[in-house]
Amino acid sequence: MKAVILISGNGSNLQSIIDNADRIDLQISCVISNNKNAFGLKRAESAKLQTAIIDPELYNSKEAFDRELISIIQQHGVELIVLAGYMRVLTPLFVSHYFGKILNIHPSLLPKFPGLNTHQRAIDASETAHGVSVHFVT
């Protein structure tokens, strides 16, 4: 299966995907980041993967940004888009365009602890169980 991975930061989930891509029959066509300083871009480059950076500050709206993101993704003819630490909320335009093809990795057992700092919030709440959610974006 051909996929594009979207990242914003360290890329630890990206690295796990890279390390297991052959095992799960996944071809990573491109890694796209909205953050030019994302360490995940270095991980992608080390794995000899194509990368792209889209700076949100260059666009006057979230929809304009997502239109550019769609344009780049369309060049790769992918079947799957993986949000691996991607820290932007996708617009309805993007979600409807790729409905059923967007997989999100979230570091908590949703619906508990959406958003940032999930691990610390779980510790602060004295949770006895904590994990990860992987779900299709709707």
Which ranges hold each PLM region?
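Short, structured coil segments at secondary-structure junctions
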Residues: 47-48, 98
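Charged helix-capping and loop-helix junction motifs
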Residues: 64-72
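N-terminal glycine-rich "phosphate-gripper" loop used for MgATP/nucleotide binding
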Residues: 33-34, 58, 62, 76-92
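Donor/substrate-binding cores of folate-linked one-carbon enzymes
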Residues: 20, 26, 84-138
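Conserved acidic residues
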Residues: 29, 79, 100
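Short beta->alpha connector loops at strand-helix junctions that form conserved
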Residues: 52-57, 105
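N-terminal Rossmann-like dinucleotide-binding module
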Residues: 1-39
